[in-house]
C-alpha cells in the first residue's frame, strides 16, 4: 500500500497528506476548489483551543436549541423544518449524552497532542501563519455559564490541560482592551491562534515538495472498491479520468457522508453552519482598540483572534439548516454588535463576512481510522475543532495506513 488518494484539501486533508508523504507514501489529493482550504478552512475563528474541547452532547444544549428555535439572532439556531437526516442525527446526538464526560476528556487530550504536531509541521516546512501565542481567555457575564465552566474545567484538568480561573480584575489585566464588565473567566496560556487558510496553503506547498500531487477543480464522480484497490473516477473540465489507488482517506468535511455511503460505510455527518467576520483594522484607533489575546464568550458562542496588525477575526454561532452556505445578515449582525459591545473603539465599517459548514458527528468526536473495506480510511467529522484536532488525527490516520501497509507486506 504505497499510493494513497486523499479526498479533500481542507485542513484535515492537507495535514493528512503531509503526514502520509512524510512517511514515504505517494499521495494524490483531490478537491473541487482551485486552491487548498477554500471552504470550511477558509475563515474560521482561528483558535487552536484545547480549552474549547467540551463536546455539546448534554441536555443543556437540547433545551437551548428548543428555546432559541424561533429566535433568528440566537447563538444556536435550528431550522424547524424536518428532514430524515436531521432527525436521525439529533436522535444519535441525544444517544451520546451519556458519553459527554468521556468524550470531552478524550477530545481535550487529542487537542493537547495536536499542538506539537501542528507546530512541528510548520517548523519542518518553514512558514509563518500569523500565530499569536498569547493564550485563550474565556469570559463570563452569566453566573450560570460561569458555574458550568467550573464543572467543565474539572474534565479538562483530567485531560491534562492547565486552565486557571481568573477574577474580573485579572481578566482586565490579561486583555486591557476589553471594554465590558465580566464576572471573571478562565485563562489557558498554552492555547494559541493563527490564520488557518494561510497555514493550510503553506503546508500544501510542503506536501508538493515531498512529491504530493494535487488535483484541483475536479469532481470525483465514482468510488469503486476492487480487488486491486480503490478506483476513483473524476472529471477535470471536459476530461474524464480514472485510476486505482492502494488506499483512500476521506477528509471531505460535510461531503464525507455521501462518499462513505458509496464505499459501504455510514458516517452520519451533519453540516452545522458557522459565521465569521474579518474586521479590517484600517485606522490606528481600531488597531490599538482590538485585542491581541484570543477571547471566547461562552454565552454568546463567539470567539476572536487577532491575525496580525491589520485583521481581527470574530466568529461564532451554530446553525442547523442543511447544506446551505447563504450568508444571512441577521446572523452577521450579532457578531458586529458583539464587537461594538466588547470593543466599542474598533470600527466594523470594513469587515468581510463569511460562512462555512462544520462537519459534525452526533458524538462530537471525529471518525479516524479504517472503514469496512480494505484500503478505506477516514479522517473526518471534526466539527468546530477541525484545526485544533487536525494534526493529531492526521498522524493517527497515517498510523492506521502504515499498519495496513505492514500487514499487507507480511
Which residues make up each language-model segment?
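Rossmann-like flavin
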Residues: 87-206
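A conserved short coil-to-beta-strand element within the FAD-binding core of flavoproteins
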Residues: 166-170, 174, 216-230
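Glycine-rich FAD pyrophosphate-binding loop
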Residues: 22-42
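Active-site substrate-recognition segment that forms the wall
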Residues: 44-52, 56-95, 222-230, 242-372
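N-terminal Rossmann-like FAD-binding beta1-loop-alpha1 element of flavoenzymes
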Residues: 2-29
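Glycine-rich phosphate/pyrophosphate-binding beta-alpha loops
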Residues: 53, 191, 301, 319-323, ...
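C-terminal lid/capping helical subdomain adjacent to the catalytic/cofactor pocket in oxidative enzymes
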Residues: 165, 187, 226, 281, ...
